[in-house]
From Swiss-Prot:
Keywords: Carbohydrate metabolism, Glycogen biosynthesis, Glycogen metabolism, Glycosyltransferase, Transferase. It holds the Pfam family Alpha-amylase_C. It comes from Shewanella sp. (strain MR-4). This is 1,4-alpha-glucan branching enzyme GlgB. The gene is glgB. It catalyses: Transfers a segment of a (1->4)-alpha-D-glucan chain to a primary hydroxy group in a similar glucan chain.
Length: 745
């Protein structure tokens, strides 16, 4: 015979609930009207509870005691003559304690229909505001709203410290139309660990990290963490206003690429990472002193495998625990901005790893990735490729980009491995890939996503920089989207990098036969808005450091590297240099160790560091070195054909009254005296920089800081001069004038 309490459950619903098979729990648990609205019933499921009372949150008074339905923890009861729903808590007596628990099943859905539409359409820019774990206040009750996308799951629960990881305690509300699951939990503290427990259609259970978590545990653990309520108070208003009106393609951009875990370390044996406060105190002043305009951070999204350097992230929204929390990262970026240093972030949207707690087969199906491995797996890295054709996946990625730019005030994103996104046959043999709808090899869905991403980000965040690492000849990477381009602001010049490093590694006696390796880039320099990048990829995996690539004795190595940097800073295009290269690190980069800062005790390394600092200062002072980077009138060869001497000479021009600068770069150890060079005007010329100066550890061959032009036409110029060209050196000359303005932000 059924008890009165048992009649409050539908036929078999109590059994299904206990077995974890009743998915529509909100229709059963919580407060509901019965008897055609003439009474209220409260049902709850609390394992190990001995007694449960209903308490009014308004006045704290007891309203009713619930009856035990069974020993498993089901309780139910009517609330006397009350017929209007009210906010309540459950006073639960356990064997060892008594707790007041605000029942989460009394709250309705907190999802907005417009948010749901945009998320499904693929155009949501703020999906992190309703997905994941977000602090909310509902009817004066504060708590955390949990929400996850898992359309093919049979059941989803949120489990964590707050419910002893019991998957039956907080089963979530399912939205059949869009595949979202949600629940609002008042009794959750910041810093609480949690996961989503999913039951697949085949009955398997899997605990997954929150794809939208903004904080995660240290590896090898992988729980998500409820974020802090307090957010960093920003103080970078002046920077943000100036950034919004800056045309970066005309400004000086000298970027210092940093891997935070190995720039510098602390501890007796260098075993401890710097935290963000350490980086504020040491990295920012260093970058400022060296004259770089920006820091580019290698990925800081949470990643379990140190050896991936962050390029295989599992927590795309969670700053890695290694250096501090989200507020610490925000404080670092804020401090950079106050020091007038921009911050860019490497962002990985091309693929994701197969870690079982991550996105892989998230709800038992290929949700974020393609089902067919010919489109869904990356053969080079054994990772998975996002399904850009799915609206929810596009929203996940678009919202993530917006999250970093909006919440962290980042000044731009550098997209990793764009080439692998653009081509369906990337690193695949015939028969291992599927053509697009037109039979071609282009990944049309990825192309559409990149166009949409760049268009929306540039509209939403004025003054940002979107940068593509793209190594093929794909046309229009930096062309506007309305002209059919991808819409990036800049593209890494991988061709220049490969050619110039190949040239750098040749013995000087043979460089004359490969002269075009340094001149060829000017044949296509204006086809895209290129950025000259010497990144981390060029100093790892047995490639050696830049210094190690160069033949000859130590003097030749250091002299050649300085001359190479001079050529790079004079070449059209923005600049990027990986950390350690600015002082000629001898060993290739090792992510497990700090840079070899002890090398700065030696004069040759000090000389390279001073040279880079002075190059950056000159670069920022003279508009001719940046304002016409992407217009052909900003550059003119004086002599690009002197392969016999391996000497390169050219002029950089600005606009109007901007001072032109003449570069002469000698890539052999031969001293040239009485070497005639054309000059853009008459009068006195200043030898602004000479890489062979004793200030930089050179042999001090040069022109004593001054050159006088003669009225003798040469190399297409009306004037010329006889100069001394130092061995393996770079000269930068310009008309004697007052110091021009700083062209950086």
């Amino acid at each position: 015979m059924m008890t009165q309490a048992q009649t409050y459950f539908y036929d078999g619903s109590d059994v299904a609930l206990l077995n974890g098979q009743y998915t529509d729990v909100f229709s059963l648990l919580g407060m509901h009207s019965i008897n055609e609205g003439k009474a209220l019933v409260v049902r709850c499921f609390l394992r190990n509870a001995q007694k449960v009372d209903v308490i009014s949150l308004k006045d704290g008074r007891k309203v009713a005691s619930l009856e035990r339905v069974n020993e498993a923890g089901l309780f139910a009861g009517t609330l006397g003559r009350r017929v209007k729903p009210f906010l309540y808590a459950l006073r639960v007596v356990y064997p060892l304690c008594e707790l007041d628990i605000i029942d989460p099943y009394q709250f309705g859905s907190l999802l907005d229909s417009q948010d749901l539409y945009l998320f499904g359409e693929g155009s949501s820019e703020q999906a992190y505001r309703f997905l994941g774990a977000n602090w909310r206040q509902v009817d004066s009750v504060e708590g955390v709203h949990f929400c996850v996308w898992a359309p093919n799951a049979k059941r989803v629960s949120v489990v964590g410290d707050f419910n002893h990881w019991d998957d039956t305690r907080h089963v979530m509300r399912q939205h059949m139309a869009n595949g979202l699951w949600e629940i609002f939990l008042p009794d959750v503290a910041e810093g609480t660990h949690y996961k989503f427990d999913l039951v697949y259609q085949n009955g398997e259970r899997h605990a997954k990290s929150d794809p939208m978590a903004t904080q995660m545990e240290c590896a090898p653990h992988n729980a998500s963490i409820v974020p802090k309520k307090h957010q960093h108070p920003w103080a970078d208003t002046q920077w943000m206003h100036k950034r919004a009106t800056t045309a970066w393609h005309r400004a000086a951009m000298s970027i210092y690429e940093v891997q935070l875990g190995s720039w510098r370390r602390k501890g007796e044996f260098g075993e401890q990472y710097f935290d963000y406060q350490d980086l504020i105190e040491q990295l920012i002043p260093y970058v400022k002193e060296q004259g770089f305009t920006h820091i580019e951070l290698m990925p800081v999204s949470e990643y379990p495998f140190d050896g991936s350097w962050g390029y295989q992230p599992v927590g795309l929204y969670a700053p890695t625990h290694r250096f501090g929390d989200a507020n610490g990262l925000k404080a670092f970026i804020d401090a950079c901005h106050q020091a007038e240093i921009g911050v860019l972030l490497d962002w990985v949207a091309a693929h994701f790893p197969k870690d079982p707690h991550g996105l892989v087969r998230f709800d038992g199906t290929c949700l974020y990735e393609h089902e067919d491995p010919r489109k869904g797996t990356h053969p080079d890295w054994d990772t998975l490729i996002y399904n850009y054709d799915r609206g929810e996946v596009r929203s996940f990625l678009l919202s993530n980009a917006c999250y970093w730019l909006r919440e962290f005030h980042l000044d731009g994103l550098r997209l990793d491995a764009v080439s692998s996104m653009l081509y369906l046959d990337y690193s695949r043999e015939p028969g291992q890939w599927l053509p697009n709808a037109y039979g071609g090899r282009e990944n049309l869905e990825a192309i559409h996503f990149l166009q949409m991403l760049n268009q929306r980000l540039y509209q939403a965040f004025p003054g940002i920089c979107m940068i593509a690492e793209e190594s093929t000849a794909f046309a229009g990477v930096t062309k506007p989207t309305d002209s059919g381009g991808l819409g990036f602001g800049f593209k890494w010049n991988m061709g220049w990098m490969n050619d110039s490093l190949s040239y750098l590694g040749r013995d000087p006696i043979y460089r004359q036969y490969h002269h075009n390796q340094l001149t060829f880039s000017l044949m296509y320099a204006y086809s895209e808005q290129f950025m000259l990048s010497i990144s981390h990829d060029e100093v790892v995996h047995g490639k050696g450091s830049l210094l190690h690539k160069i033949p000859g004795d130590d003097w030749q190595k250091f002299a050649t590297l300085k001359a190479y940097y001079g050529f790079m800073w004079g070449h059209p295009g923005k600049k990027l240099l990986f950390m350690g290269s600015e002082f000629a690190q001898r060993d290739e980069w090792n992510h497990n160790h700090s840079l070899d800062w002890h090398l700065l005790a030696f004069e040759p390394h000090q000389g390279v560091q001073r040279w880079l600092r002075d190059l950056n200062q000159l670069y920022r002072q003279f508009p001719a070195l940046s304002v016409l980077d992407y217009e052909s009138q900003g550059f003119r060869w004086l002599d690009c054909d002197n392969g016999r001497d391996s000497i390169f000479s050219f002029v950089r021009y600005g606009e109007g009254s901007d001072v032109p600068l003449v570069f002469v770069v000698n890539m052999t150890p031969t001293l040239h005296q009485g070497f005639r060079i054309g000059l853009p005007q008459g009068g006195d010329f200043c030898e602004y920089l000479n890489s062979d100066s004793h200030l930089y550890g050179g042999s001090n061959q040069g022109n004593a800081g001054k050159v006088i032009a003669e009225d003798l036409p040469w190399q297409g110029m009306a004037s010329s001069a006889l100069i001394t060209v130092p061995p393996l050196g770079c000269l930068i000359l310009g008309p004697a004038t007052d110091a021009p303005r700083d062209t950086s932000l």
